[in-house]
Each structure stands twice: as C-alpha cells, then as structure tokens.
C-alpha cells in the first residue's frame, strides 16, 4: 500500500498561489471562483483567470477542482448553471460539493463532471459515503474528526477515492454543522461567510483574563504519512485558501519531499 501514488492537493486563494503551488509540486489544485464557494472572503478567481488556470494545469498534467461547497438557494440555480458552463467546457476536473440539491443539479446538467463530496457534507462513516457513491460521487472528503480506522473502513467498504485534510486549520465543531458564525455575527459559514468566531479570545467563568478556548491547534501530519497511506487515503489535502501564496507553495514543497 505504501508504494501507491497519492495525490498531493494544494489550496489556491488567488492566481499567484495557484502558480506557486503548481511549481512547488502539487498534483492538483482546489480553488474557488467568484460565487458558491466556502471562502467568500478569499481573493478567488475571475472566470478568465480560472479558465487559464485549468488550461495551464492540464499542460503540465495537473488537475483543478472547483469548490461549490455552500448551500445554494432555489433562486440561484440558473446562475449556477451559467457560472459552471465555461469551466466545464475548459475541462474542469471535478467539483467539490456540500448541498445535495447542487449535487443532483450538477450531475444532471453536467454529466461528464466528476463529483466530490465535501467535508461540509459531514460524511462520518461508510453509510454516508455509500449513499454518495450511489448518487454518482467518485470521491469523498470525510469529516476531519474521524480516526484513521474510520477512514480505512470507508475505503474498504465503498472503494471510493478518499481525500483527507492532512495539514492546516481545524474546526472545533462537527464538519459542516457549525452555526456559531451565524448566531454570533450574522454571517453563515454554510454560505461561505464564516467570521471564525472560534479564533477569537474570550473570558471564561468570570475570569478577566482572555483565552482561546475554542481555537484548535492546526493539523500537521508530516510524521504520519505512512499511516495515512496505509489507511487507504488517495489524496492528501492541504487546507489554506485564505492563506498567502507563500504558504501554499511552502507547505506544498515540504510535503512533496515525502
């Protein structure tokens, strides 16, 4: 198992980060356009930039996945079709999806498109993954809170491609289930507008001194790569579409060495 080829999947919040990650050795890049992505406050990509990135990646034998990982309103589906069509024609390699309505819509409207179940779908076991497979998904991003044994079980039962976060920020809540930003700041994380209140300092139990009780340490699995491969993971995903281009290139280069 350890000799199998594993995809190194890097984030890109803008064109500079994209080219940096590609030349640092990423096998694939995931990014968002100017609509329907979970990082609405990233710089993101214009239509022309994104099409250019797809073509450039393909020249080098790399892949590009587009995030469509927010909840979409009924009134927005016609806009979603027009939004995706240029990328579909350019040969976009796959879309990462949260909303099952969006999933069904893209499956029917763009039949050649690869469909990936986002970590925002809260896939925590084999039954959720098997359901997605029956709906037409070829890849799933399990919830970040799963153990390696739970991930291994999903792989063994479903045979699907497994994409897992291996580096970057962690969520204190269940993947895809956090409403903290909506409640505290009126900005919905499930619409790509998370204010990240979990990263803020708070006072606890009447103590005047502020602390960070909800801000988790970032994930780093550089010392666990053999175990990750043995668990059947097919794609190593680096978190960080809100990070600087230097971060995307630097972290990608480090993991590429392994």
Q: Where are the regions that the model predicts?
A:
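Extended, alpha-helix-rich binding/interface surfaces that flank or overlap catalytic cores
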Residues: 238
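Hydrophobic alpha-helical bundles that form the membrane domains of multi-pass transporters
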Residues: 135-136, 241
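Conserved nucleotide-cofactor-binding alpha/beta core module
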Residues: 126-127
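Active-site pocket-lining/capping segments in soluble small-molecule metabolic enzymes
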Residues: 2-123, 141-145, 150-235, 244-258
């Amino acid at each position: 198992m350890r000799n199998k080829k594993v995809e190194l999947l890097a984030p890109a919040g803008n064109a500079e980060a994209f080219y940096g990650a590609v030349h640092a050795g990423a096998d694939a890049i995931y990014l968002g356009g100017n609509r329907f992505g979970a990082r609405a406050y990233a710089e993101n990509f214009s239509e022309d930039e994104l099409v250019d990135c797809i073509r450039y990646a393909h020249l080098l034998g790399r892949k590009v996945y587009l995030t469509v990982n927010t909840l979409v309103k009924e009134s927005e589906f016609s806009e979603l079709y027009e939004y995706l069509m240029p990328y579909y024609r350019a040969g976009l390699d796959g879309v990462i999806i949260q909303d099952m309505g969006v999933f069904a819509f893209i499956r029917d409207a763009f039949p050649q498109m690869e469909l990936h179940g986002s970590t925002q779908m809260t896939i925590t076991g084999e039954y959720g993954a098997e359901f997605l497979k029956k709906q037409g998904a070829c890849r799933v991003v399990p919830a970040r809170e799963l153990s390696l044994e739970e991930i291994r079980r999903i792989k063994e039962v479903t045979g699907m491609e497994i994409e897992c976060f291996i580096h970057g920020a962690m969520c204190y809540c269940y993947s895809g289930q956090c409403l903290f930003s909506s409640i505290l700041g009126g900005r919905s994380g499930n619409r790509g507008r998370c204010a990240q209140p979990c990263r803020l300092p708070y006072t606890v139990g009447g103590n005047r001194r502020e602390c960070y009780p909800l801000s988790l340490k970032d994930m780093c699995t550089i010392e666990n790569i053999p175990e990750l491969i043995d668990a059947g993971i097919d794609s190593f995903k680096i978190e960080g579409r809100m990070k600087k281009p230097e971060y995307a290139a630097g972290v990608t280069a480090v993991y590429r060495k392994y």
